[in-house]
Design a protein with these regions (language model features):
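Glycine/proline-centered hinge or cleavage motifs at structural transition points of membrane proteins
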Residues: 107-108, 121, 391-393, 405
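Transmembrane helix boundary and interhelical loop/hinge segments in multi-pass membrane proteins
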Residues: 88-100, 111, 124, 157, ...
Length: 506
């Protein structure tokens, strides 16, 4: 609720007024959406713990009791999850029903009444989508309770499932029941969204629709907006990440006894091979999951966009449900499926091996890839593929000469999104990692649980920095490929013309 309200308020201000800190707010929102919650939560632990940055350097004695309480955790989650509402609602507000707004004002409506009776009702789908995104991501979040478990015990369903698996004796029955409850809650939230929206129409794109252009605010309001935007970007990003950087250079578990040292980085990178080994495992799993997920996701998106398959609507709904399933529930499901004696008798030994992490990561990546590719394919008319088919082009030629050239940027975005999400998927890796096999996210999480703050902070900065550099490098290397032979490079390079020339030349 609070995350939706906060994100909606910022989105409306961002669309209505033009201020310099708006771009900074956009960047912070996208970084928060990509960055795993357990890394943000660890930063808040380093900042607000009893011997953290806030108390030791700023003299805020009561900060620990405020942050590590139910209201404090709600505050942290709002700061971490509001970008879902901000980005969703901001996208919906980019077009304005100007004709309807003028009609309301002519009939005596004030600016507030015009927003309440015209703009807000038309954005109900965006508000509902934002609310359910925040709700599903929060209720299934395993990273935050895992990250703060060393300093504060806050029981959530995902963490209770994790504890059931690592209790003595192992309670598979309890883990299964709690996972079922969690899925039921998520399904109930999705049903509630459909009931609120019903069969009403919310489309308003016509000749009276114009793109919203931010106005220049009054001087005092502009200063206030810039200060607010800069402060929010600092609070949401610089506080947790900056605290992690500070702790990574500390020679003590307490910032109060801070002494600058590079020993943490030396131990992580040079003396201990665990980080590099975990990073190698995570990169391999993420690459395999992204490639396999991209192949399967491309096929699913093609079926949903261009085929007459009778059950494609069912596939679309299932992909949305799969997108909502938390990683810890997915991991439990894979344990129940693959930890069967008859499967071992068939020679399909998956449980207790890295292969099961790859399978679970593929399952988690496919819904994300499918949504990204489906949005890209929706812009390519089916008539183009139908015309190529009439000229004798087979499926592989249509994909190779039409879809791939036009979807280069979308494919790269889908691959990198799946790759980054798989590297930092703490829930799946924690539940399914085999004995004597570590991954980057598990390695970092274990360090925090063991109160090795400086060591785990250095591992976070080093490992996360390497992953970010690899993603940026991949983006730079594929930038030329995304532009090469694109439809903007002349009519002779357009996919439909290349196809026609190829058919004429045999």
């Amino acid at each position: 609720f609070f995350g939706t309200i906060f994100g909606a308020l910022l989105a409306n201000l961002r669309i209505k007024w033009e201020f310099k800190a708006g771009k900074l707010l956009d960047i912070a929102a996208w970084i928060l959406m990509i960055m795993p919650s357990f890394i943000i939560a660890q930063g808040w632990v380093y900042f607000a713990s009893g011997n953290g940055v806030a108390r030791a350097w700023l003299g805020w004695d009561g900060i620990s009791s405020l942050v590590f309480s139910f209201p404090g955790l709600v505050f942290i989650m709002v700061l971490n999850k509001f970008p879902f509402a901000y980005v969703t609602i901001k996208s919906a507000l980019e077009w304005k029903p100007k004709r309807l707004s003028y009609a309301a004002r002519v009939n005596g409506a004030t600016a507030w009444e015009e927003w309440k009776t015209v703009q807000a009702p038309l954005c109900i789908p965006a508000y509902c989508s934002a609310a359910i995104l925040i709700f599903m991501d929060t209720i299934g979040d395993f990273g935050l309770p895992s990250a703060i478990s060393g300093v504060y015990r806050f029981q959530t369903l995902p963490y209770a499932i994790y504890q059931a698996l690592y209790s003595s004796p192992i309670r598979f029955d309890m883990a299964g029941v709690l996972s079922f409850y969690l899925v039921l809650i998520i399904i109930a939230a999705m049903v509630l969204q459909y009931l609120i929206m019903g069969r009403k129409r919310f489309d308003f794109m016509d000749t009276g629709t114009v793109q919203a252009v931010p106005e220049r605010p009054p001087r005092a309001a502009g200063i206030l907006l810039n200060i607010t935007g800069t402060f929010l970007a600092f609070l949401t990003l610089c506080v947790p990440i900056g605290s992690t950087v500070i702790m990574s250079f500390s020679d003590s578990i307490s910032v109060a006894n801070f002494g600058f040292t590079l020993e943490n980085y030396k131990n992580v990178i040079l003396e201990s091979g665990e980080l590099l080994k975990g990073l190698e495992h995570s990169l391999g799993i993420a690459a395999a999951a992204a490639v396999l997920g991209l192949l399967l996701g491309f096929f699913v998106s093609y079926v949903m966009n261009y085929s007459d398959f009778a059950l494609k609507r069912v596939i679309d709904v299932l992909s949305l449900v799969a997108l909502a399933v938390p990683g810890v529930v997915l991991g439990i499901g894979y344990i129940f499926v693959w930890n069967q004696r008859w499967i071992e008798n068939l020679g399909l030994q998956m449980y207790g091996t890295p292969k099961i992490i790859v399978l679970a990561s593929v399952a988690a990546a496919i819904p994300v890839i499918t949504r990204v590719l489906t949005g890209g394919m929706a812009k390519i008319p089916g008539q183009m593929l139908f015309a190529a088919r009439l000229q004798g082009a087979g499926l592989s030629m249509r994909v190779r000469t039409i879809l791939l050239p036009l979807l280069k940027a979308t494919i790269v975005s889908a691959f990198l999104s799946a790759f980054g999400g798989s590297v930092f998927n703490l829930a799946i890796n924690t539940v399914l990692y085999p004995p004597n096999y570590t991954t980057l996210s598990v390695y970092i999480s274990k360090g925090v649980e063991n109160l090795e703050f400086g060591y785990s902070a250095a591992a976070t900065i080093a490992g996360g920095g390497i992953v970010v550099l690899l993603i940026l490098l991949a983006e730079c290397l594929t930038r030329g490929w995304k532009r090469q032979n694109g439809p903007e490079n002349g009519s002779e390079n357009r996919p439909e013309n290349r196809l026609e020339n190829r058919l004429e030349n045999g």
